[in-house]
């Protein structure tokens, strides 16, 4: 099953934007993802929703951050995270795709910087694959802004992900041996920029319960869509859930 990286990003930014010091929230949700891989239909799966903001570290979904420096306007941290992007040929309906090798999710380590202004927050981050699955790295640059409308909070975000050549080729390339087995043309993916937009809504019910919903859209570049593994040029993700705020 393919799990789009936006599932991780959709809730992580709004948590960071709204959480106060030492705030913990735990919950569960469902994630719907339109996979760009051929042979996949829409995917829906249950996911945990976890957020903690402390003085020296934080948990924002699948990212653990250790704060190196923090001020009113800036935060710099070391990060350890889980990259959920994966491809399992056993879950695919297309015979040719079933002949390809599995692409595993992986652990990432890197650095993240947040800069806060009245008009919003800028995030810049970079992280490398520490399990050597792809031997690649991923960067992100985004801006988001929380808007309060009564009890409802809305957080639109605009950003771009950067996949280096090794990362792109691991998840979207086709080797010569895979080509011979599957009949698909071999393909070497290049580094790629993936723009995305998202909107997250949060609505508290009482003192502790918070309802959440978020939608994200990614436009895939030709470095990815030219791969025979891919049959669409966009990816859509929707996540909804409920959490308990301590």
UniProtKB/Swiss-Prot annotation:
Which InterPro entries does the UniProt entry name for this protein? MipA
So which domain of life are we looking at?
Answer: Bacteria
Q: Name one GO cellular component term.
A: cell outer membrane
This protein's membrane topology, according to the annotation, is: Peripheral membrane protein
Q: Name one GO biological process term.
A: peptidoglycan biosynthetic process
Keywords (alphabetical) are: Cell outer membrane, Membrane, Signal
Signal sequence span per UniProt?
1-21
Concerning its family, UniProt says: Belongs to the MipA/OmpV family.
What this protein is called in its record is Putative outer membrane protein YiaT
Q: Which organism is it from?
A: Escherichia coli O157:H7
The organism's taxonomic lineage, starting at the top: Bacteria, Pseudomonadati, Pseudomonadota, Gammaproteobacteria, Enterobacterales
Gene name per UniProt: yiaT
